[in-house]
Amino acid sequence: MVMDMSLLEIRGLETEFQTEQGVVKALRGIDYTVDKGEVLGIVGESGSGKSVGMLSLMGLLAPNGTVTAGEMIFDGEDISPVKYKTKKEKKEYEKKMNAIRGNDISMIFQDPMSYLNPIVTIEKQMTEGIRAHDKCSKQEARERAVELMKMVGIPAPESRLKQYPFEFSGGMRQRIIIAIALACNPKLIVADEPTTALDVTVQAQILDLLRKITEESDAGVIIITHDLGVVASLCDRISIMYGGNIMEEGTTDEIFYDPKHPYTKGLLNSIANSNADHREPLKPIPGTPPDLLKLGDQCPFAS
């Protein structure tokens, strides 16, 4: 029996940044897969490389960043920039990614106020991508935008389309970001810290919305977060990142109830437990994250 290919396969992905201090190897040969209809959580503290991995996938690295090795097989096609060497080839790569970004792969960013243009109406920001990828009329794009706003729970969408980002609350702006991400029925949705800037009540609402989307869609989803509570409630599998490496990968139950790697165990032990004796202090992970300028080939947690 032939196994179906995963929607996304990352194999040996390496990304580095040129800095004044030297070369920072931000990703050191990471591997993971995402299947259709699956939710993968990528968890790690700040600087672990989790967002760099997604920017590498989307072709959105800063000018000093480069994917130096690895394959990124999306829907059966390698979209890694590694094989594009000449100026002409790099233009071909950018043309390919422009067709994929926002269409087949979409991204939900963590700070909606920074992502949304403050001087452009919500209607224009929502319909721009729809018209670019679907080649539809202005009226058809507007109807799709209204439909999407209803889907993500924004009341009176017809009138609110004419408003600007500052006229919406933080939670509503995040819903708009999610609506934009869903506009072209993507095969893969990447959510980068989708609840970080929101209060607890709004976080729960956004998580419920993401859960509903994953249940009703066949799209694969990647959730990037440092919040283990988010992945526990939403994800099928979890990859734990540290120092540019994936330290451990498993189902949500395996990671939470049977962790293998010392870093994963330390991460779980450092979480406040509502059932624990509150007189006992939290157990922080000792030491500091490794300096990626100096880290060799050893396990970053062992360093």
Residues of each region from the PLM?
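Conserved ABC transporter NBD signature motif
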Residues: 67-81
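Short catalytic/signature loops enriched in Gly
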Residues: 81, 155-158, 251-303
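A short, surface-exposed alpha-helical micro-motif characterized by mixed small hydrophobic
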Residues: 231-233
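ABC ATPase NBD coupling module
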Residues: 79-106, 132, 255-259, 292-296
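A short, proline-enriched helix->beta-strand linker immediately N-terminal to the Walker B motif
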Residues: 183-187
